[in-house]
Every structure is written in structure tokens, then in C-alpha cells.
Amino acid sequence: MEKCDICHQKFSNKTNLNRHKVMHSGKKKFECQFCRRPFFRNDRMKEHMMTHIKKGNTFECPITACNSKFNSFTSLQFHVDSEHIIRGSSPAKCKSCIKWFNSSHRLLLHFHTAHLDHTKFFSFKPAPILPKSTTSILNPIKNPDDFDRIFDFFKTEIAPLFPLHSTVSQAPLPQCSRSVKSAKELSPTPSTEIETPEEEELDGPESWYCDYCKIRFDDKVMWYLHSGLHSDDIPFKCSLCGSLCDGKYDFAAHLVYANHNF
């Protein structure tokens, strides 16, 4: 284990430690090419760039030998997850370079931020972005079964992680323990030929992360459902009723205790 000599946080390897120590320097050297917002880390900057890119109107499947095209990123994402089985035992190769990926999320992120000519593929002008704003992965949730599922999940798993009137903890990120059937199989042992993900700083299998609530999900479906609760324009605006919340604690409490009738 590697340990930061400034804040004493521990990391599984030196690469993750060095990436972490950049934040202590105060220098944000990675800049979004759309809105010029600076970031400490390249992977966080790429995730942010996708909030602009998803507003486009032409999306091509990034997998070699597949020529499918879509008019929304959500449709492309559904296509990749349902038509192409991407995991450790069957990685996919980017059609524009020699890199292989064992995660559809990482492949889509790589393809759209590393290769595309955005002025050609996306006919829009990026609007000024609000602090910490992003575009939700999903459209607002409409299935009643999904509502019941996500609210039950918040009450039993998420609410205890956000006690009211508490201060921000310096402890490691909370890990959701909900055991639900995963959207796809994952392999804990990726091929050595596959690009090492920059965003991974925790040991264990691939997880899905909410950048606003600071929660990692072991299950992709629950991450999808959770992401859909954040509004497109303002992260802590409830997509179900439009209520504005004051940060992640207020947002979690609102989802658990507010009366959402549909």
C-alpha cells in the first residue's frame, strides 16, 4: 500500500498515489475544450466533456466492424450494452486505434473524447456550464417499478450514509452493498493488453460512481436509476418533482422523505 505524506490516505499503487497528490498541488492542468473549465485529473475532465458531447445528434458505435449510428447517446449506450458483450474475458477494440477495453463505459468515453472531430459530428455550440453541472445519463424515470426500487434502495442503503446535520467525513468513499443482479458479468482479472483505467483508485471489481453524491455502486442498474434522479441542468435538482436541494445530504434526505406521488 502507498500512503500520501500530506493527508495520509492510502492507495493500492503508486500511480493512484501520484494522481491523488496532484490535488494537493492546487494546479488544475486539464481543461475542457468546450467550456475551458479546469480539472485536477484527466479522467474527471473527460467525464465532464461527455456532458457537452451527449448534447450532439450523431453517435457512432465505437467497436471495430460495427457501423451502427444513432441520434442520441442513450440509444448508442443501449446498443453497446445489449448487442456487444464487453467484459474481461471478451474485451472490445476501439475502431480508431489499437486500444482494447473491458468496459463499455470506458470504451465510449475514450472514443468520444480521444478521436472524434466534435465540430463535425456535433452540430451545437456548448452553452456556459454551471459549477458541478452535468447531463444525466438517463431520461427522467417513468416506470413505477423503478420508483419503488430506487426509493427502497435509498431508504435502506443510501440514507444511513448521509446522516442529517453531519459534517463531511474524510473517510474512504462509502461503498453500496446492495446485492442486485448486475447488468452484465464482470471479470476481476482484466487482460494485460487492456488500457488501465485512470479513474480506478479502489481495489475490487469495476464499480459505478456518482460524482455528486460521492457514492460507488457495485451494480450498474442501481447506478443508472440513481443517475436519473439528478436533473440535467442542476445536479441537486430532483428530476422527479423539480425541488432544488442544498447539496448531497439534502438531496438524499429529499429522495427518502419527500412525498412523490405519480
Curated annotation (Swiss-Prot):
InterPro entries named in the record: Znf_C2H2_sf, Znf_C2H2_type
Zinc finger (C2H2-type) in chain: 2-24, 30-52, 59-84, 92-115, 208-230, 236-260
Species in which this protein is naturally found: Caenorhabditis elegans
GO molecular function annotation: DNA-binding transcription factor activity; RNA polymerase II cis-regulatory region sequence-specific DNA binding; zinc ion binding
Protein name, UniProt field: Zinc finger protein ehn-3
Family (UniProt): Belongs to the krueppel C2H2-type zinc-finger protein family.
Disulfide topology: none
Location(s), subcellular: Nucleus
Biased composition (Acidic residues): 195-204
Effect of deleting the gene: RNAi-mediated knockdown results in abnormal gonadal development in 10% of animals whereby gonads fail to divide or grow in size. This abnormality is enhanced in a tra-1 (e1099) mutant background and is accompanied by masculinization of gonadal tissues.
Gene from which the chain derives: ehn-3
Biological processes, Gene Ontology terms: gonad development; positive regulation of gene expression; regulation of transcription by RNA polymerase II
